[in-house]
């Protein structure tokens, strides 16, 4: 039996096409993936992300534990509510998961992990927490709704109470704050402004309906994927996994190398990979007809005249740009052009930074 989120019936009311997503019954779309995509780029859309797992880490050693567990450094978080993104690595520097961590107090951090990796993550976190004075608490009674797009904040403000709006007024990107029963965060997976709202399951249906009443368009996994790919955001299991290190997944910026005496899990392996050199994740753009897809091979000739090969990790048609885009893992020596093999022939592509659309506009 697939898991169902607390919003399952609301999806059916909006005529969602439901699919299995890592053991969860989730909406693929509500009729038109393209319309849902454009709603987020041009107005406001919302996603049920209640399949994500909220984990609270509390105790006197919470900071020390997370500084060991994560490649990014939570000690950088000084202002309550500030969040950071980063990888949780194994001893070989493989990515167990990518996650967001919120600093709430010196003894209270909130971590949001992916649904596909939940059991693995929880087991790893529990194992690594031994010897630290911390309590790790999964919060299954909490649902999550992401409201994204240029008009998302205004439409959400019409739903929040006066006290909630006052609490989050002027909140910068990548912050989260408890406001009444809602934990409201200025994070997202679309490249647009908006909120990710953690809400008690008992209130989730009412919040979803209130947002619907404000004209926020429900959006499914299909649009979520094209939006995140346009924004150059990784999807765990496609763009990286335990066989990939963060340097090869465009996550180098999330590694806190300083201070050098912080011995986070995977550090030694990662330093060796850094010194030896790794593949890298790049963006590909193909302006002629056709769609770049996961697993298609990528070819280029390096400066020494040697043919090199990589692979597409994620590819799609970009509704915002009107042509196909992809992320590909390739040898470091790639230039600004390459070829992709599709339908038994090679097609020329441009190589760009893996960030295609930001705030509705072309980003490369």
From Swiss-Prot:
InterPro entries: GCS_T, GCS_T_bac, GCST_C, GCV_T_N, GcvT/YgfZ/DmdA, GcvT/YgfZ_C, TrmE/GcvT_dom1. It catalyses: N(6)-[(R)-S(8)-aminomethyldihydrolipoyl]-L-lysyl-[protein] + (6S)-5,6,7,8-tetrahydrofolate = N(6)-[(R)-dihydrolipoyl]-L-lysyl-[protein] + (6R)-5,10-methylene-5,6,7,8-tetrahydrofolate + NH4(+). Keywords: Aminotransferase, Transferase. GO terms for molecular function: aminomethyltransferase activity; transaminase activity. Pfam families: GCV_T, GCV_T_C. Its EC number is 2.1.2.10. The keyword Transcription does not apply. GO terms for cellular component: cytosol; glycine cleavage complex. GO terms for biological process: glycine decarboxylation via glycine cleavage system. It comes from the Bacteria. Belongs to the GcvT family. The glycine cleavage system is composed of four proteins: P, T, L and H. The glycine cleavage system catalyzes the degradation of glycine. This is Aminomethyltransferase. It comes from Shewanella sp. (strain ANA-3).
